Amino acid sequence: VLMSLVALYGCSPDDDTATGSPLITGPLAALQGTWKYHCYAESGKHAEIIYKISGTHISTSKVYYQHSSCTDESYKEEGAYSDLSLGDNITSGKFSEYQITYTVGSYGRTPLDNATTNSFAGECGISDWTENSYTNLLDNDDCGFPKNTTFLNVYKVIGNNLYLGDPIDAASRTAFPTEAKSNFI
């Protein structure tokens, strides 16, 4: 079983009066901002995640690297999610944990070098990957999920760290995780 905690470092929420976006208050305010998790090992690869949360919208970018130095980009997965909403408070310790839901609007992959582009041939049922070109994976039975799928997750914020039950793009569609994990595996 893949256990995941995304311990991401971010900035604190602020009033986005420059863009006219409303200020989010309450528990969702703690999620606002940009969260980064730098150069971690995932399934034999190394990656960097960036989550940008603004209002009820989430954008994700996960760049995979060829080496542990995280300098040679291999490919990138990007997603956009909306309708972020707060569910139940499931606090069992001293830090508040909340259930959240969000809906996928776009999701895809971009190979970033020739070797990766060639290695993707046939992956996800797609034979014509193009280097530096985004490929939509929504409604792809092999590598994606249906558009407007709602994901179920949990989160807590401790200091400047965001903890999730599962990564944004890998959360369950059928049941909430029982807790925001303390390890990222």
Predicted regions and their residues:
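Sec-dependent signal peptide recognition
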Residues: V1-L2
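Short, solvent-exposed coil/turn segments at beta-strand boundaries
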Residues: A30-Q32, I50-S59, V154-Y163
